[in-house]
């Protein structure tokens, strides 16, 4: 089953109007898991690519029923959205000083009420004992392999 998250094309809008990299989208994932189980799924393995790793990791952090999922597969996942913003910003605007991205993050927190700290899922993933397959190439321009290395260690 492939699901879409709130704020996606044709999907329900989050009250914020923004895709929050799992902070709210994990609820959509939980609904999809329940749907699969109610319709006969014997095992549930979640697969998240890039930003799709956020909702999975947020689900780990927020669920009261971790036993519903039998495994996770991640490909170049975003487990820390602040780092993703900085890396993507530097890739798209290499002439800007790196410190300016901290200002943009701070401004987004104030202007849009985004809680970037709530989108740091690294410890939740590290402390979860569900089987996980994590792979990530070292030429990824958007998600640094060091973020996956941190999880793997």
Model-predicted regions and their roles:
Residues 127-129, 134-136, 140:
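Short beta-strand/loop motif that positions the catalytic acidic residue
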Residues 1-13:
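Conserved alpha/beta-hydrolase
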């Amino acid at each position: 089953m492939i699901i879409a998250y709130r704020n996606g094309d044709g999907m329900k809008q989050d009250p914020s109007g923004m895709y929050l990299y799992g902070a709210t989208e994990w609820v959509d994932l939980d609904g999809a898991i329940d749907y699969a189980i109610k319709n006969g799924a014997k095992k549930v393995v979640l697969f998240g690519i890039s930003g799709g790793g956020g909702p999975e990791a947020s689900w780990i952090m927020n669920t009261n029923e971790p036993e519903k999922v039998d495994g996770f597969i991640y490909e170049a996942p975003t487990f820390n959205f602040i780092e993703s913003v900085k890396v993507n910003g530097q890739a798209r605007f290499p002439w800007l000083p790196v410190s300016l991205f901290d200002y943009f993050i701070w401004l987004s927190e104030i202007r849009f009420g985004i809680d970037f700290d709530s989108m740091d899922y690294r410890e939740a993933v590290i402390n979860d004992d569900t089987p996980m397959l994590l792979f990530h190439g070292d030429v990824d321009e958007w998600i640094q392999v060091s973020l996956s290395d941190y999880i793997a260690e």
